């Protein structure tokens, strides 16, 4: 209640930790609501800065609540559509967190209705949305920086195949680490992350 700590799924915390955020880093979280990764990043970048964004204004309130509750002074929150490129942020970020819209099949244990609602057509549409957002996200990363891609799903199309496609299109990036968590095998949500390193100029 006093904001000394917060509870977060292990998989999400592992993803943010794997990004290697340093105390002085500038971090962009481009699909941030409800703000768990934003606040975790802000804890790592205590002398740095986190720009936290989401397209849904009503969800920004959740981020604000979490930031205020944890008494974090290094976070700015903005309403922003991640499919729209922000020229002013080009090559500015040390780390970009791209936890993107997905089919959510990794959290069926908490939301059982997902398995009845998700269709192949929806997954195909989400894959293209993810691809579009990644094209913007990768341009915000400065040389030597990191792009963290993550989803709370388990499909190869949204995870490993998405990253393979990205790397073919962007030779300036290399895969540093990737990990797939599975419910029933790991003691956490189904979740995927890939840490992508941008080569120096």
Q: What kind of region is each of these model predictions?
A:
Residues 1-201:
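S-adenosylmethionine
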